[in-house]
Amino acid sequence: MKIKDTLNMGKTSFPMRAGLPKNESIWQKKWDEDHVYEQRQKLNEGKPTFMLHDGPPFANGNIHMGHALNKISKDIIVRYKSMNGFRAPYVPGWDTHGLPIEQQLAKQGVKRKEMSMTDYRELCRQFAMQEIDKQRTDFKRLGVMGDWEHPYITLQHHYEASEIRVFGAMAKKGYIYHGLKPVYWSWSSESTLAEAEIEYHDDKSPSIYVAFKVVDGKGLLDTDTYLVIWTTTPWTIPANYGITVNPRFDYVQVQVGDKKYVVAAELLDRVAEEIGWENPKILKTFKGTDMDKMTAQHPLYDRTSLVMNADHVTLDAGTGLVHTAPGHGEDDYKVGVKYGLPVVSVVDAKGYMNEYAPGFEGVFYDDANKQITQALADKGALLKLDFFTHSYPHDWRTKKPVIFRATTQWFASIDAFRDQILKAIDTVDFKPSWGKTRLYNMIRDRGDWVISRQRAWGVPLPIFYAEDGEPIIEEETINHVADLFGKYGSNVWFEREAKDLLPEGYTNPHSPNGQFTKEKDIMDVWFDSGSSHQAVLAARPELSFPADLYLEGSDQYRGWFNSSLITSVAATGVAPYRGILSQGFTLDGKGRKMSKSLGNTIVPATIEKQFGAEIIRLWVATVDSSSDVRVSVDNFAQTSEAYRKIRNTMRFMVANTGDFDPEKDTVAYDELGSVDRYMMVRLNQIIKQVKTAYDAYDFATVEKTISSFLVNDLSAFYLDVAKDVVYIEAKDDPKRRGMQTVMFAALLALTKLITPILPHTAEEVWPYLKQPEAYAALADMPEAEQFDDESQLLDIWSGFMDFRSEVQKALELARDNKVIGKSLEAAVTVYPSEPVRDMLDDVDANVMQLLITSHFEIAPATTQAPANAEQFDDMAVVVKHADGEVCPRCRMVRTDIGTDPKLPQLCSRCAAIVEANFPDAVTNGFDK
């Protein structure tokens, strides 16, 4: 027998190296085969429901780091809630309609106009489903648990039917209307866009000042006076029918050479500098209200432009007189309608000037800027041309600029129930709190929602037209269409004639001959996803409406959060969510947006292959995702190191509780040593803190609290101290079993606490814990206990940890001075102040063991510390090399080695342990 055979060295098959890239897939396969998600749902039947509703990602392409951040965050919450007393089903979803899929098919050579609409839409459906399969694999590879076999998909028949019913509920209340209004128009995709489909990029635009000659100055201005406007869209000058001024502002007529001009008084100096007027002389000052209904000559066409009053005119830029084209601007439209101006669009669907822009027909609008500017110059109306770069709206899919263009569209009136939506926002809890203001302001300031789209791949608007062109939006017809969609899918709209889509025997006074046509436009995709609260939450029996939480990127304040709120309040009167948690974007290590063109993209698959999905999950738990998050390979390397520390500490506890049977070896709390009870109290604190942080969705605090406890409390202190007991004492020694009791309790609690973040690692530890549940994911979160001596222990041991820290400094200095090597070579004498002396009396533990030294003594109170002592605020410390020899079993420096003649190699403590437990060693001696 060798000396090491008498030690209780921890042994385990739990590997030091995680092998995450390989082993995670094995665990994920087991979860699927054993239906762990379904088992968890069954366990939670009858418990209160927590409903996190998944915002559907678009089914196009593999997932990126933003997807990973979002889906893992959701998974952490759902796993935690499921383990903490809630029934928390998670149904993933996908958004499948819209332009990107049409674009992908075009790239593959599919020609939409060379096939039937139903054949084309079938290709779109097939592409979407193939992308869903790809993304489902990606999400599951991240360890995300959910009902992956029964996701919700916006192209599902029942989903489309529910969406039609949401539309019907809005129509019934009078919120849907048909109108000619300027809307965001994407010439690159030939369709209207919602505000949520707009993104801003810098663009270079012309900046022109144009003079309109007064025709009727209402007795205030002569006809030799010019009204000066400023615009950055020369192509809209042919659509000009008016000039708008603010009734409250002061305006001036100024003489410049032999010309007279009118600008806002406050902007005169700036305009004069821009145009190059020298010494403009003010002739008159008057209010904007005095100019109301004056007229001026259009600089290009034989018609007049009307001067109008409106409050939207500001002094931020320009001249204080606003070029007004009712067909190409929202404010222009509002004031134009008020004054009875025509609403004319001078651009067609593809962005080319049309017949309403004589002289420029067939010219692309951006090219027309140059031609129109030249025409203005030729007429003597151009006062200044310049160029500047500014933030300009672009199509979020094609990345091309968009324009405002008046078209006849279907709208949802926000004004009709705006106050109701704003009141609903007050019922929602927002994290971060600024989200409430952001969403409130967006709803308060937004215009009506244009819900029609001129595309092929989407849910048709369930609207019919009578013989006289009257739209038919009736409860009976809408419900019938919803039933048809539920049975056959929305393709039925394109497969059948209008009469075959109407209820049998349907008649309408506007169609005396029984002839009907159907709407060709489809729904805005935001109406698709925005109807999920009814199509999914209210429709599926295992789910519930409203949701407890919507968790998405901060761009969804103008997207899914927004559209869902509008449709939900319209259809049901309440918000679809009780809480919103928003996240920032994932950027590269330099804070730049990730893009293929910059070559700075990092995809989850790459990180999974190098580090494992567990490292991505741990990274998600360490970042503050309420704002933008930087991502680099270095981040994951650092996270991998943090993971290694967590794993190694847990592995140590697994190894050193291998011979511990919790059923028979557990030591009651009251019988534990002081340091053991202190660690139980600390564990209790950790359980409370971690669960509080989970409840607040504060993953960073969860991770920091767990890691700090593992690394600082356990690895750097308790487990280090425990080695002298767990390794050295007899297997069933009460002190050893006491420390194993603490280790096992910590390991069990921490494994449960890390399961939502590190599920693969938790499952790897779980079999060693001998628990009744087959998987950690099926266990419940640990409950904090109540210990009567908690505050007393925390007070005592807080003082001891300060004391220990100072002794460690003294040991480090002794090591630097070559007095000792390891701390076990040290003999420590302390000269404490009275409070420290009292604390050491209260600790009630072997201080030498706690300091991991071979000798420790407290000098008598009357003894003066020697000059060579290390001085601290409340004590002095002397460190010497301990007298004696190193015991080969406990590694302490002892003066009593050989005192037992039967075991002359050992110190008296080790000899007594070996003699009592290993008689062969006494009889035969140790092998060399």
Curated annotation (Swiss-Prot):
Pfam families: Anticodon_1 (PF08264), tRNA-synt_1 (PF00133), zf-FPG_IleRS (PF06827). One of its GO terms (biological process) is isoleucyl-tRNA aminoacylation. ATP binds at K596. L-isoleucyl-5'-AMP binds at E552. Keywords: Aminoacyl-tRNA synthetase, ATP-binding, Cytoplasm, Ligase, Metal-binding, Nucleotide-binding, Protein biosynthesis, Zinc. The keyword DNA-binding does not apply. Its cofactor is Zn(2+). It comes from the Bacteria. It is found in: Cytoplasm. InterPro entries: aa-tRNA-synth_I_CS (IPR001412), aa-tRNA-synth_Ia (IPR002300), Anticodon_Ile_BEm (IPR033708), Ile-tRNA-ligase (IPR002301), Ile-tRNA-ligase_type1 (IPR023585), Ile-tRNA_ligase (IPR050081), M/V/L/I-tRNA-synth_anticd-bd (IPR013155), Rossmann-like_a/b/a_fold (IPR014729). Its main location: cytoplasm. A motif ('KMSKS' region) lies at residues 593-597. Binds 1 zinc ion per subunit. GO terms for molecular function: aminoacyl-tRNA deacylase activity; ATP binding; isoleucine-tRNA ligase activity; tRNA binding; zinc ion binding. GO terms for cellular component: cytosol. The keyword Ligase applies. Monomer. PANTHER family: ISOLEUCINE--TRNA LIGASE, MITOCHONDRIAL, SOLEUCYL-TRNA SYNTHETASE. IleRS has two distinct active sites: one for aminoacylation and one for editing. The misactivated valine is translocated from the active site to the editing site, which sterically excludes the correctly activated isoleucine. The single editing site contains two valyl binding pockets, one specific for each substrate (Val-AMP or Val-tRNA(Ile)). This is Isoleucine--tRNA ligase. It comes from Lacticaseibacillus paracasei (strain ATCC 334 / BCRC 17002 / CCUG 31169 / CIP 107868 / KCTC 3260 / NRRL B-441) (Lactobacillus paracasei).
